[in-house]
C-alpha cells in the first residue's frame, strides 16, 4: 500500500489528514519452532507482508480505531482512561494493551489518537498479524507522543500485551523479529539471553514460498498453552537430578541420559522436540553461514518431522503441504512455520520450479483437504518503521 493511499484512506474515514504513516512487517520462522518459550534459539525473519497504518494525535482522551480488514465494525471508540480487555472491542484489544503498558512503563500518552489500519497478512495464518499490529501501535505512539523508546523495550511490551492482556502464553520471537528485522537478513536469536545476530539470507537461485493452509488458527483457543505447560512440567521432573531453568539449556546427549526422569511418554516427546529443535537451529545457522543450502534444507525437513511426531502440532493440512513439497523437484526443504494447528508452511525452492510447486502441491492439497491453499513469495523486510510524516 502506498503512503498516498494510506493518507487518502485515513482522511476518508476520519475527515482529516494523518500526522504520519507507518508499516510493521509480519514474520516467518526459518527454523526453531516452539523453542522461544523453552529458552532456546529461533531463526525468524521479517517479511514484506504486514500491517500498514496511519495515525493522528487528538486533543481529547478518545482513541478511535478503524481497520479496513474489519470494515463491518466501523470506528471503535475507547477512552484512554478505560484500557481494559473487552471481547466486544475485537482487534482493538491489542492496541489497548500496548498503550496501557507503555503508560505503565512511564511513557506519557496523555491524549487520544485516530488510528487507521490495513493488514495484508491473512488473519489466522500464523505469520504474526497480532504481533505486527502490536509493534505498529507502539511506533505510532512513539512518533506521535515523541517517546524516547528503546526498540527492545517496545518488543517486550508487545510480548506482555500478548501474554497478560490477551492471555496467550507465547514467547518473544514474533515481536523481536518484527521490531528488529532487517532487509535480506534473518535474526538468529537466543531467547534466554536476547543476544542476536543478523545473518545474511543468501539463498542463491532459491526463494522462500509461503504455503497457506487457509485453515484459520485461534492461538488462545488452541493447544499452544497446553504444550508450554507440558514442557514446564518436564523441566520440573528433570530437575530432580538436574538444575535447569529451561529445556534450551540441554543438548541431545544430556537429555537422552536423563529423559527417564520424565514420567509421561507424551511429555518425553514434547521435551525431546524442544531440545532437538534447539540443536537443529544452531546447526542451521552454521549451514547458512557456510553456504551449505542442502544441509540447511535437510534441517528444515527434520524440524517438520519433529513437530509432526514429537510435538504433534501439525495436522493433515500442514503435513500435506510439507510432505507434498518434499516430493517436488527443486525443493531444498519445507516445513510448517509458526505455532501450527493450521496456518502456514514454508518451502525453500528453486526460482524456476516455483510454478510447478504451486500447481502440484495445490492440486494434491485440494484433493486431500477439500479446499485450496494459497501461495506467496516471502521477501525479507526491515522492521517496524515510519513511512512518512506530515
From Swiss-Prot:
Q: Where is the active site?
A: 174 (proton acceptor)
Q: Where is this site: Transition state stabilizer?
A: 27
Q: What GO molecular function annotations does the UniProt record carry, in alphabetical order? A: ATP binding; galactokinase activity; magnesium ion binding
Kindly list the positions annotated as binding Mg(2+). 130, 162
Quick one: which residues bind ATP?
Answer: 67, 124-130
Matching entries from PROSITE patterns are given as: GALACTOKINASE (PS00106), GHMP_KINASES_ATP (PS00627)
Location(s), subcellular: Cytoplasm
UniProt keyword terms in alphabetical order: ATP-binding, Carbohydrate metabolism, Cytoplasm, Galactose metabolism, Kinase, Magnesium, Metal-binding, Nucleotide-binding, Transferase
| Residues that bind substrate | 33-36, 224
Q: Does the keyword Metal-binding apply?
A: yes
Any one GO CC term of the record:
cytosol
Catalytic reactions of this protein: alpha-D-galactose + ATP = alpha-D-galactose 1-phosphate + ADP + H(+)
**Pathway listed for it?**
Carbohydrate metabolism; galactose metabolism
User: What EC identifiers does the entry list?
Assistant: 2.7.1.6
Top EC class per UniProt? transferase
Q: What are the GO BP annotations of this UniProt entry?
A: galactose metabolic process
Q: What is its main location?
A: cytoplasm
The UniProt entry's sequence similarity note says:
Belongs to the GHMP kinase family. GalK subfamily.
Sum up the protein's function in the record's words: Catalyzes the transfer of the gamma-phosphate of ATP to D-galactose to form alpha-D-galactose-1-phosphate (Gal-1-P).
Tell me the protein's name: Galactokinase
Taxonomic lineage from the root? Bacteria, Bacillati, Bacillota, Bacilli, Lactobacillales
What's the encoding gene here?
Answer: galK
Amino acid at each position: 500500500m502506498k503512503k498516498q493511499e494510506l493518507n487518502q484512506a485515513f482522511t476518508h474515514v476520519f475527515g482529516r489528514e494523518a500526522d504520519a504513516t507507518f508499516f510493521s512487517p509480519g514474520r516467518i520462522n526459518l527454523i526453531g519452532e516452539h523453542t522461544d518459550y523453552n529458552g532456546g534459539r529461533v531463526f525468524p525473519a521479517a517479511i514484506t507482508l504486514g500491517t500498514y497504518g496511519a495515525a493522528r494525535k487528538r486533543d481529547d482522551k478518545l482513541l478511535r480505531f478503524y481497520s479496513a480488514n474489519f470494515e463491518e465494525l466501523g470506528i471503535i471508540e475507547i477512552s484512554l482512561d478505560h484500557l481494559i480487555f473487552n471481547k466486544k472491542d475485537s482487534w482493538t484489544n491489542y492496541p489497548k494493551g500496548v498503550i496501557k503498558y507503555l503508560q505503565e512503563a512511564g511513557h506519557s500518552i496523555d491524549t487520544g489518537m485516530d488510528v487507521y489500519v490495513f493488514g495484508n497478512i491473512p488473519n489466522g495464518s500464523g505469520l504474526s498479524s497480532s504481533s505486527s499490529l502490536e509493534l505498529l501501535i507502539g511506533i505510532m505512539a512513539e512518533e506521535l507522543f515523541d517517546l524516547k523508546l528503546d526498540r527492545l523495550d517496545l518488543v517486550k511490551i508487545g510480548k506482555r500485551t500478548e501474554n497478560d492482556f490477551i492471555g496467550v502464553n507465547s514467547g518473544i520471537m514474533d515481536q523481536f523479529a518484527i521490531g528488529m528485522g532487517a532487509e535480506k537478513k534473518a535474526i538468529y536469536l537466543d531467547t534466554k539471553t536476547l543476544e542476536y545476530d543478523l545473518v545474511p539470507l543468501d539463498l542463491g537461485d532459491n526463494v522462500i514460498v509461503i504455503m497457506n493452509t487457509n485453515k484459520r488458527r485461534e492461538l488462545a483457543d488452541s493447544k499452544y498453552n497446553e504444550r508450554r505447560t507440558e514442557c514446564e512440567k518436564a523441566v520440573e521432573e528433570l530437575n530432580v537430578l538436574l538444575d535447569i531453568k529451561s529445556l534450551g539449556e540441554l543438548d541431545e546427549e544430556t537429555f537422552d541420559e536423563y529423559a527417564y526422569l520424565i514420567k509421561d511418554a507424551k511429555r518425553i516427546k514434547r521435551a525431546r522436540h524442544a531440545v532437538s529443535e534447539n540443536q537443529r537451529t544452531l546447526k542451521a545457522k552454521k549451514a547458512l553461514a557456510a553456504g551449505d543450502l542442502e544441509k540447511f534444507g535437510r534441517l528444515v525437513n527434520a524440524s517438520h518431522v519433529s513437530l509432526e511426531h514429537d510435538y504433534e502440532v501439525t495436522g493433515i493440512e500442514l503435513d500435506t503441504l510439507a510432505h507434498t513439497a518434499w516430493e517436488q523437484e527443486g525443493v531444498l526443504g519445507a516445513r510448517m512455520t509458526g505455532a501450527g494447528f493450521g496456518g502456514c508452511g514454508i518451502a525453500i525452492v528453486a526460482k524456476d520450479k516455483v510454478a510447478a510447486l504451486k500447481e502440484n502441491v495445490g492440486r494434491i492439497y485440494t484433493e486431500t483437504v477439500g479446499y485450496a491453499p494459497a501461495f506467496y513469495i516471502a521477501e525479507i523486510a526491515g522492521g517496524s518503521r515510519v513511512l512518512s510524516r506530515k
